[in-house]
Amino acid sequence: SGSTYYLGAKVGAELSMMENRFTPARFKDGYGPVGAWFLLFKAKTLNGLGENFAASDAAKKELAKYAPYGTAAITPTCLRNHLMLFEMKEGRGPIMMDTVTALAELGKTMDKKELKHLESEAWEDFLDMTCGQANLWCATNTEPEKKNSEVMPTEPYLLGSHSGCCGFWVSGPDYDWVPAAYKIKADNGKVYNRMTTVGGLFTSGDGVGCSGHKFSSGSHAEGRMVAKQMVRYAKDHADFKPELSLSKEQIVDLAYKPVRTYLANCTFSTADDINPNYIKPNGMMYRMMKATHEYGAGTATYYMTNNKNLEIVMEMLAWMREDCEKLAAGDLHELMRCWEIMHRIWTVESHLRHIQFRKETRYPGFYYQTDHMGQDDKNWFCFVNSKYDPKAGKWDVFKKDYIKLIP
């Protein structure tokens, strides 16, 4: 998804809701998903004192600060994270998934065969998605029916198809009930569903902003929709002849520049990853992660940032973009990583520019803008969009009206 955002943004496609991030709760160190334990096994999370903190009066009081979202029948994911972080900062960690009680309660209505099948489901939940979590359970002698496991929020992710809604501002379908502001007309005056603000550039799945919770099945369906619209667009522009702004030789030089940088300088040092004339993508990745974790509302600060921290991280990202000119790749895998880290830096910058622009904390538990705590629905119940001007080399960030379609 990071490459999707970069490739579209660099040619001027309008982005939307890039401040939205997904910071899921996961089993610590192994990244095992918690959804099955909450929904299928009906497990509860406990603080370090063994208390079901989410059901406490203190939790209800804390959630009331974020009404109407915090007082809804179903607590939003970000606020569930907020409660977890609240316990940890109050010194009542770690947070444990009570697998022991959950399996014991389910076992009361099952025979031995059914219970064994249930325990197998617990393991398969990890083997289906994060094998490392199953390995971790083995390595730590963890049997979920006998020993609880620690959970905590992860590092932030940017995506538009799961529990996140960042991506491109795209056209809706050409139906009467769709507001004109939600339609993008092509040069022929027609509307093509899921076309970005750049004519002929389409996206789907993670690429579509303001449209989360599609997951795999919804993204697949959206992909089919987009494919049909692309065919329709191509037929309507049968005479169009695409022209590249660079020659094929220039494109090759650009794509393989990190390899040539490496070959020209690799003899200057005995350690392959330490060199006065280049930086490896792995080193740039750690540099970006350190900057964003410490200044961009990452794990190092319990997902908190403020105006000053955002100014600092923006300066750091500008330096990183400059230094990307000296990225070096010793093989094809590193060449891929070079381009990947460039895409990540641009994507992270768009994310933080949106947080910087939105003067509120829209998603407590996912991030906190401590200079603008709490939601401000009066002024910020809207989309935040941005556009990069490739010719001027400048960003423009602005509001976009939210039009309620479903009563």
What kind of feature is each model-predicted range?
Residues 189-258, 262:
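Catalytic phosphate/nucleotide-handling subdomain of diverse soluble enzymes
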Residues 11-12, 49-50, 227-238, 359:
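A generic secondary-structure signal for well-formed alpha-helical elements
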Residues 236-330:
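Long, amphipathic alpha-helical stalk/connector segments used for oligomerization, subunit docking
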Residues 1-33, 209-212, 216-229:
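Glycine-rich loop(s) and the adjacent beta-strand/alpha-helix scaffold that form part
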Residues 13-20, 233-246, 365-367:
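Acidic/polar loop patches that form or flank catalytic/metal-binding clefts of enzymes
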Residues 17-212, 294-407:
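Mobile, glycine/GP-rich and aromatic-enriched active-site lid/loop segments adjacent to catalytic centers
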